A protein has these predicted regions:
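Non-catalytic helical/linker scaffolds that mediate oligomerization, partner binding
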Residues: 1-247
Length: 247
C-alpha cells in the first residue's frame, strides 16, 4: 500500500486519470486508495489465486477490471486459466464494470503481417465475454510493425461491432436505477454513479453519456459501447431546456 501512496502522491497533480493496481488481493486496498486519491479511476488487475478468490468484492469496488492472462496463468496454472477468465468476466459484468483483456492479444503480428488463427479465436472469445478494451503490450511497445497491428485490430473490432445483434424488447421501464436492456440509451449524469447499473443491462447497445465532469468521461471511455460528451454545467432543475438550448 505504501508503494502506491508514494507513487500516487507524485502524480496526483498530473493529467493521469486512471491507475492500474497490480496483484490486488481484496477490496481493502481499492477502498483506501479511492478515498485518498478520488481523482483517479482504480483499475484492478486480478492475476493471482488470492485475487481470484476475492474476485467478487474486487469487481464490486473497482472502477474497471483488467485480466492479465500471463501473470494469472503463471499463478494458477494454465489448466485453470479458462475457467478463471470466465469467472472474472462474469463478475465484472455482474457489477457493470468495464473489462480490459491484456497479454499476448496479437503477439504473432510482432513478426508477421497477419494474426494467427489462435489470435483471431482469442479475440473473438474476448468479444463474446464482453471485453470492453483489448490491451496491446509488447505488440506495440517493441515491434516495428506496431502501426500495422493497431490498424488491423481497429478494423477487426469495428467489423465485430457491426455484426453484434441488436435486440429490442417492446417493454421499457424504470425500476429505481435499473434500466431495461437492449435499447439505445441517452444518459445525463454528473458523477456517473449509475453507470455500473446501466451497463449491467446494456452490454452491446449504444449508450450516449452526457456529463459535465472529466472523471465521468474517463470511466465512460472504457466501455466499448459508450460514447461520452462533456457539456457545459448541467442544470438538473431544467434539463429539458438545457438539452434543446445546448445540444
Amino acid at each position: 500500500k505504501n508503494i502506491y501512496i508514494d507513487y500516487l502522491e507524485k502524480f496526483k497533480n498530473s493529467k493521469i486519470n486512471a491507475v492500474g493496481l497490480s496483484f490486488v488481493q481484496n477490496k481493502d486496498l481499492i477502498i483506501y486508495l479511492k478515498k485518498k486519491f478520488s481523482k483517479f479511476l482504480m483499475i484492478s488487475k486480478i492475476e493471482n489465486s488470492e485475487g481470484l478468490k476475492n474476485a467478487d468484492e474486487i469487481c464490486k469496488f473497482s472502477d474497471a477490471i483488467m485480466i492479465d492472462r500471463g501473470d494469472l496463468s503463471a499463478e494458477i496454472g494454465d489448466n485453470n486459466l479458462y475457467d478463471a477468465i470466465l469467472k472474472i468476466s462474469n463478475l465484472t459484468k455482474k457489477y457493470g464494470k468495464p473489462l480490459i483483456m491484456a497479454t499476448e492479444n496479437l503477439e504473432t503480428m510482432s513478426k508477421s503481417n497477419n494474426p494467427s488463427k489462435n489470435d483471431i479465436i482469442s479475440l473473438g472469445f474476448s468479444s463474446q465475454i464482453n471485453s470492453d478494451v483489448i490491451m496491446l503490450s509488447e505488440e506495440t511497445a517493441t515491434s516495428t510493425k506496431w502501426k500495422n497491428i493497431i490498424i488491423w485490430l481497429n478494423n477487426f473490432l469495428i467489423s465485430r461491432n457491426k455484426k453484434l445483434p441488436q435486440q429490442y424488447d417492446d417493454r421499457i421501464f424504470w425500476e429505481t436505477v435499473n434500466l431495461v436492456k437492449d435499447y439505445t440509451l441517452v444518459v445525463f449524469t454528473k458523477k456517473g454513479l449509475m453507470l455500473d447499473k446501466i451497463f449491467k443491462k446494456s452490454n452491446t447497445n449504444d449508450v450516449f453519456v452526457f456529463t459535465d465532469t472529466k472523471k465521468t468521461k474517463s470511466i465512460s471511455n472504457f466501455y466499448k459501447n459508450a460514447k461520452c460528451f462533456v457539456t457545459g454545467k448541467i442544470n438538473n432543475k431544467n434539463l429539458s431546456k438545457y438539452y434543446y438550448d445546448n445540444i
